[in-house]
Each structure stands twice: as structure tokens, then as C-alpha cells.
Amino acid sequence: MSQSPSLHQLQELNPFLRRHLGPDATEQQAMLNALGIASRNELIEQTVPPDIRLNRPLDLPAALDEQAALAKLAGYAEQNQVWTSLIGMGYHGTITPTVILRNVLENPGWYTAYTPYQPEIAQGRLEALLNFQQMVIDLTGLPLANASLLDEATAAAEAMALAKRVARNKSNAFFADEHCHPQTLSVLKTRAEGFGFELIVDSVDNLAKHSVFGALLQYPDTHGEVRDLRPLIDQLHSQQALACVAADLLSLVVLAPPGELGADVVLGSTQRFGVPMGYGGPHAAYFACRDDYKRAMPGRIIGVSRDARGNTALRMALQTREQHIRREKANSNICTAQVLLANIAGFYAVYHGPEGLQRIAQRVHRLTFILAAGLEAKGIKRLNQHFFDTLTLNVGGAQAAIIESAEAAHINLRILGRGHLGVSLDETCTEQTVLRLLDIFLGVDHGLEITALDQLALPEGIPASLVRRTPFLAHPVFNLHHSETEMLRYLKQLENKDLALNQSMIPLGSCTMKLNATSEMIPITWPGFAQLHPFAPAAQAAGYKAMIDELESWLCAITGFDAICMQPNSGAQGEYAGLMAITRYHCSRHQPMRTLCLIPSSAHGTNPASAQMAGMEVVIVDCDNDGNVDLADLKAKAHAAGERLSCLMITYPSTHGVYEEGIREICDVVHQYGGQVYMDGANLNAQVGLARPADIGADVSHMNLHKTFCIPHGGGGPGMGPIGIRAHLKPFVASHPVVPVPGLDPNNSAVSAAPWGSASILPISWMYIAMMGPQLADASEVAILSANYLASQLGAAFPVLYRGRNQRVAHECILDLRPLKALTGISEEDVAKRLMDYGFHAPTMSFPVPGTLMVEPTESESKAELDRFVEAMLAIRAEIDEVQQGNWPAENNPLKHAPHTLADVLGVWDRPYSLEQAVAPSAHVRQHKYWPAVNRVDNVYGDRNLFCACVPVEAYR
């Protein structure tokens, strides 16, 4: 009889599970042994409160292997019909240069990095973002730009908030041109609702009739009209109001920059700079403003500073103005935004350079001119006198026949009322595209030829007064890398400066830097997902609908909620969307007075900022000495609020890294007083398969798909923050003005520009759940095991600040460095910088408690990597002891000088510790050395000498 294993024995039940989990069964058992317990189940019983446990498998389909999951998802992609979409409205066909596609978008060195809070190990993407800012500064004609926002519509809402904060006109009204994109107007409506602003949507011809603190103008407008904005801007300035302009970035290559026309704020999308439409996202918005408003600007700003040796170094500037610092005083809850996509757009400009961009923009405009000339020659009336790439046409009774012809040619046009059609050309269009359009509008026997039309002496589409005269992108970085060889090497040089997950663990607490598996990432560039316009007819997006519906059903099964709203395109947007749904719910019950939001003192800064944006008054609830919500204080404040109580925002497990025993009672108290419970989903990775937010008592919660469900952080975005909702809140979530959500009131205004947010990255989370199935619980259990293992190994050297039941932590733990700082002067920042010399990104610094490090290892890190981190931390503790014992001076030791660079090696060495101790402090580092690009960055200098544009090349030498 054969002794070889049977086919059944050789068939793995869940082959992806062992790829996703870092520690194998043997390593897990060794970690359990170190904790003095026998099994993972015993650990979970000791850690998770029994009254919230989900004591059954998740109701999910059995896990698929990688090939089967890819095949099923490919079937969905094939159901999507990729037509030529000439709808416009802020979304356009574009060509992603393949050198950027392969070496940035598909490169884990770029997409697995985190927000550059530790600039010494992020100089590559900081330089890329500085390039992005310089591109925006040059094209808009304004002196200051940020490093991206979420999308054009939310950027417009941010502009409105900025205008209210800084304008001298104290009106409570904001004006929006009725010819702005409809999705932008909808998001403005939502934001104005939360802030209590009056939003006036009207013709710009009536602007002078209104007293406003600011206005939004579209350039060119949604129908393609290129209007001289100077008279409108002068009118606004005469009443001390701000002029905000939403501008098509490619058009600014040939149009006069809005800054030169007098605009105070310019914003828009960079999607058509090489970023696929992706059924709505993700795309990087841009935002530029006058220098006077720098402290009111939303989002991250990259600035130039210097390091400890005086060399040029980049960093995130003016961070004290951000939401996590200003909390309930913030005008914005924007956290990180769309860094990966901003980098792609910036690299698109680097690769093409000013001449390349001019060629692209002029070609798009010329094709549009030729189309306009042909249609005009045959009597079709154009409604916009001037244009860049968009024509709005009056075709009268021929509209239906033209639409039918366009559909037969697989071309999507913008369908407007009253016999009007819109057509927007883009970089992907050719002469053949124009000929097909002439056939569609005029019939195949029109007799027109492209060459002849190109030679017609007709009025130009852009008036002479609005032709761009100002040079742009003169900096060398936009003029040196136009061959693929040079571009490839430039991208690699930048990548090598950064530390990402493809090199080492990133143990950032509250960030869940887990594996972003290759099989999860591959589908996002498939044309069936990448090339769809978000406003394409539903029949062309059947595959997207099937995939999203299935993902929503899975997320409901995982969380216990009744429905999912996919529109929020970040975690902070999810918070805002959920709170707005709560506000609308209370108003529907004739309880508009319910505006008070209770938030624990430990909450992330986005929580109070989001509540303030939703029109709520924030009341802080104390935490006790164990880091838990003070139940007595909660009860007292809920009672005091009474009928004014709107909701409680709470993170679970808590931001202190423990499962609070009283979470059910906390929810019950809020419900007793008529409030709703908003559960921040930042720590959902410690709940999946073990507990469900809705079962615990949450009414609404956002899910960070870029944490728990494997969408990569991209160096600071993209992300997705869909919300799960109980049935009673479902009628009040965001809909969309262009693609209404079935079953919702179409008057429910939007929170994001696209109906399903950043839809093209949803396949990542779909793949993760499809390949894990009910074994998602294993990921949560191993994440908890890894965190407890680190706590046990490090607790003697660095006290763990908070522990839960049985002295266990959840999926992360807080190491308290304050006693050591008091003894030695060595701070949490010194330890964070010294970890770079050991090849690690630091844990989260000083959140949620100043003077601490919060460590989250995730389930994806092997025991060997965890042990390497433990070795590094214990070695650092030994170095601190050397300082404490007086063997090294308090200000002249490896921690105070960290990180160490090649410049230190090449310079004069006169420090009281060896060069080897400085740059090669462990055996692993001696074999796998990562060199920080700069020494410690001087933050104070950078803010006092703010400079947020590209510096001369000589500065890097």
C-alpha cells in the first residue's frame, strides 16, 4: 500500500492564511510559552471580555486560494465595460507612464510606507511631495501648496472652511457658482450644513447681490466655459471676501494661472496627471493659497529645514496647526490624504517636464478645437463660447439619436437636459476619436477631414487675455529625468532613502501596518477596474456593483451592522459621515437640540475635529488611572446633557490598547439618554472574528480598510473609511447627486466626490476577505498574541502603561518612557531616532499619552522580526543605562545624536562611543544596513524659516 499522503491531505484548506500570518504554528507556540499559556484560545479568554465575545465563526464564505480569488475577481472586472468616457466633470482619461506604473504604483517600496512623521527615514517621498507642491505652485500661480487632499469636492469644502476662518467679511454665507461640478456642490452643501453656513448656489451674474465671506468659482466651469474671473474676484475682494477657484490642472498649462487673476485659494484634482479614473478614486486633490493663510491651510505641508549637520532636510511643516493638535478647535479633520497618488502626479510632471505637459495640453485643446470647428461648420450650436477641452452642445431633438449612435460606438457623453450634450476630450483621445465623434453627431457622410479642419482660421477657444504667459516647472527636477533610464534611476534613488514594509516591521500603534499582499494589489491596475468613469452608466459597471455588494455583505457579517456606506474615502471622512447621519437622524425625530458629543480624553484628534465639523459641541469624558473611560464621569455628563446628548465617540479596544470591561454599560448609558454610539474603527483589527461593534452597542462605526483590511498606507494615503450603520440610521447616510443611491433620499448630500469613494482600491479588501474567509479571526488572535509577546519581553525594561484583564493588552501596547526621561533626559524622540540605526521605523510617539511609545506589531510579523525589535529595544535600554551611570554625557551619546548617517562615518569622529556602536549596533544591521538619508531634522528651524517649494539642486550636495 502506498505510504504517500493522499490528495485530500495535500490540499490546504486555507493556503493564504499561512502566507498572511507572520509566526507559524511553532513560533506561535513559543510565544504562548513565553506568556505561560498553552493556546491562543486561552489567551483570548484571558484578554477579551466574555460578554462581548462572538462565540461562533464569522458567516463568510470558505476561503479561496490566491488563484481562485484572482479568477473570481477577474470575472467581476470582465463584467465592467470599458468604454471611451468623454463625460468630464473632473474625471478624464489619462496615460500612466509605465515607468511610474511599475516602479511606484506597483512597488511596495512606495505603497507600504507610512506618513512621514519620521522625516529622517522618509526623505524620498518627502522630496516627491515637495515636487508635487512645486508643480501646484507653478501651475496655480500661488506661493503655497499642500501635499494633497482627498478629492476636488472635499478640497472645495476645505476652502470654504478656510475662507470663513480668515475672511474679514463676517457674513455667514458662502457663494458657489451654479456651474461648479454637481458633486462639488453636494459636498459643499453637506459641509455647510455641519458648520451652519448659508450656501448660496447661483449664477455668477448675481454674485454682487450677495454679501458673502467667500465664493467658489470653477475654471473652466463644468460645461467647459473659460471665463475671465478677474471681475468676479475683484467683486469679492471689494467686500473683503475670499475668492476660491476650482481649476482643471491640465488646463492651467495653457490658461492664465488663477493666482495671477487674483484668486486667494486654488484647488482641484490631479487625476489627469497619470492617475487612472478608477471609478472615482483614489486621486490626489491639490490645494494652494496665499502665504497669509498658511496656518489655516488644511492637510500636510512639506517644508525645507536642515539636519543636525546643517544639511538640507525635508519634513512636514507647521504640524501644530493640524487637527490632532487643535482637536475641537480645528476647521478640518483631514488627516493624511492621497500621498501615493500625489507622488504619481508629481512624477508625471517630472517625467514629461514643462514641454511635455505643454504638448499634451495643447494637443487636447487642438483636438477639441477641431471637433468644435467641424460641428459648427455643420450647424450644431456650441453653448460655451470659450473652451479648453469641453464642449456643451445644443443638439435639440437629435439628442436621443446621437446618444444611441454614441452607445453603438462605445462612447459615453455627458447627457444634459433640454437637448444638450457635453463632450470632454483628454490625453487618450486621437484624431480617430474626433472622427468617430463627428460621425456620431453628424452621420457618417459628413465629408469633414481632420487635416482641413485643423487649418481653419476660426476664433481660438481660449481668449487672448486668458492665455498663459508665465513659465512653469523651471526647477531642474522637472527638466532632468525625461529619458526612461534617468527617470527609473531617480525613482530608485528616492525609494532607497525611505524605510517601508519591504525592509522591516513598522510597529506603529493605532496604524495596523500589516501585510499588503501582492495578490491583493495586482487587480487595482486591471483596466476593468482602473479605467471606468465614476459616472458611467450603471450597466457598464455591473462587475463593480457585484464586487461592492459582496464586500458590503461581508463587512456587515464581520461587524454586525445592517448596511454599509462606501462613500467616505478616509477614516476621518467616515467619522464625519457617521456623525452627519446621526445629526440627520435626530432632526428627523424633531430633536435638533441634540448636538452634544461626548468624547473620552484619550481619543484621536480626528474625533473632536469631526464632531465640530458636524455641528456638535464637544464635551470631554475623563479616563481613570487604568486608561478606561471613567464611568461615573460619563454618567454624570450624559445626565447633564440630557436631551442635548447627540452621541458618544469611543474607540474599541481603547486607544490605550486594552479591552474596556464596561463597554456594554458605556453604550447602554448613552442609549438611556437618547444618544447614539459612534465607535471609531481604528482598532477593529482586534475585534474581527472575536467581537462585533454592532453587537457591543455601536450604532455606527467606520472601518479603516487601509488598516484592518489591507489597503496599503501609501506613504500617507490612500485610505478608505466606509461606515457600518444600524437600520435606523441607514436613511440618513450620504447619497450622490449624479449617481443616487437606491433607497436613499436624493437630497442626502454627499461627503465625497465619487459615489463609492476610492472604488478602485476596494478590490484589495475584497481579496483579503475572500482569501481569509472565517479565518479572519486567526489574524485578530495572532495580532493580540504578538502584542502580548512584545509586552512580556519589553515590560521589564520599558513599563507597559496600561493593561487590561489578567494583565493582558489588546493588539497594541504603550511603553512608558517618562520615568527614564526624568532620570536621564533621554526622551521618547531619542529612542525613536535611535531605532532608525537599528533598521526600524519607530512606534507611534507620544500618542495617546505624551512621553510614550505605542507599539502595534500586527499579525503579519514573524517571531524572528519581533525578536529583532525586542533585541533593538533592549540594546537601546542598555545605552540609556550607560547615560544614567555617567559613562556617556547626557547630550553626547548615541541616542542624542541618532540617527547616524554616512556623513558621520566620513566626517571627523570625536564622540565618546565607537563608530561601530553608532552605525552598526547589531549583527543584523551589519548584514542589512539601512542608512538614514539625513541626521536628525531641526523642526524648530523648519517652522521659523518656512520654505515649501523645491530647493536648488546644490542644496542636496
From Swiss-Prot:
It catalyses: N(6)-[(R)-lipoyl]-L-lysyl-[glycine-cleavage complex H protein] + glycine + H(+) = N(6)-[(R)-S(8)-aminomethyldihydrolipoyl]-L-lysyl-[glycine-cleavage complex H protein] + CO2. It holds the Pfam family GDC-P. GO terms for cellular component: cytosol; glycine cleavage complex. Keywords: Oxidoreductase, Pyridoxal phosphate. Disulfide bonds: none annotated. One of its GO terms (biological process) is glycine decarboxylation via glycine cleavage system. The keyword Lipid biosynthesis does not apply. InterPro entries: EF_Hand_1_Ca_BS, GcvP, GDC-P_C, GDC-P_N, GDC_P, PyrdxlP-dep_Trfase, PyrdxlP-dep_Trfase_major, PyrdxlP-dep_Trfase_small. It comes from the Bacteria. GO terms for molecular function: glycine binding; glycine dehydrogenase (decarboxylating) activity; pyridoxal phosphate binding. Its EC number is 1.4.4.2. The modification N6-(pyridoxal phosphate)lysine is found at K707. Its cofactor is pyridoxal 5'-phosphate. The glycine cleavage system is composed of four proteins: P, T, L and H. The glycine cleavage system catalyzes the degradation of glycine. The P protein binds the alpha-amino group of glycine through its pyridoxal phosphate cofactor; CO(2) is released and the remaining methylamine moiety is then transferred to the lipoamide cofactor of the H protein. HAMAP family: GcvP. Belongs to the GcvP family. This is Glycine dehydrogenase (decarboxylating) 2. It comes from Pseudomonas putida (strain ATCC 47054 / DSM 6125 / CFBP 8728 / NCIMB 11950 / KT2440). The gene is gcvP2.
